[in-house]
């Protein structure tokens, strides 16, 4: 008996056949958003498009409010959950229109173009099954008598001959190297975490935020700046610059961060050392005194050597 409905066979029994879509979201008008936010979209988890936009608001964190509109790379507005495609990139907007001039760095190469979906769902042709068991012997009738004899299958080569033709490979020990190198090979190399204090630029009443920096927690410098934006909460927007408070040097990579130091977080504005908080000003004074003492001690050493 054949079914007349147009649904797939699996949907008759109440099984979910829709695939989830993994999408990458970017903030509208944020040119420093590089990696994007990964999110999983499925119709069983989000019943309506409004529920999905609330989830986007929590993950993306727009500076203009909640996510109200979502656009694809070809500038088309998404109207339903079914419009999302697995592996594609999207821009989240609030009440403001789509900013086509300031484009996030992560999608500058593909913005304005239609993305090509991966054709990984096509069924691949299955390989024919080849049995490793030899076929059974076939009976061969004889002309002189009525009895039948079975022909034994002939082997291509005996085990002794095959072993003589293929020489044995030498066994290489995994512990042939030195003891020190073998210990380093199996040991887990871990870096020490760096604990720093971060302050708002131009806010003399900010007491600072304690941030732990580790390579396993933050893979890139942009991820660290996103975490600083959540903790420090600059009134001018996200954290785009990080300055060393004692010298005013701009930090360009995560490797330049020093454990136990004080840093100033800024947006697009420049560093304002006149509005440092009392805690930050005291730290800068102590650092300058330590540097002066080190310079004085280094100058005294050559003089003592000349005397002796």
UniProtKB/Swiss-Prot annotation:
Tagged with keyword Glycoprotein: no
Residue ranges with Low complexity bias: 141-167, 291-300
GO cellular component: cortical actin cytoskeleton; microtubule; microtubule organizing center
Stored InterPro entries: Doublecortin_dom (IPR003533), Doublecortin_dom_sf (IPR036572)
Domain (Doublecortin) ranges: 21-104, 194-277
One Gene Ontology term from the biological process aspect of the record: intracellular signal transduction
Compartments, as annotated in UniProt: Cytoplasm, Cytoskeleton
Disordered: region residues: 115-167, 282-308
SUPFAM superfamilies reported for this sequence: Doublecortin (DC)
Name this protein carries in UniProt: Protein doublecortin
Name of the gene this protein is made from: dcx
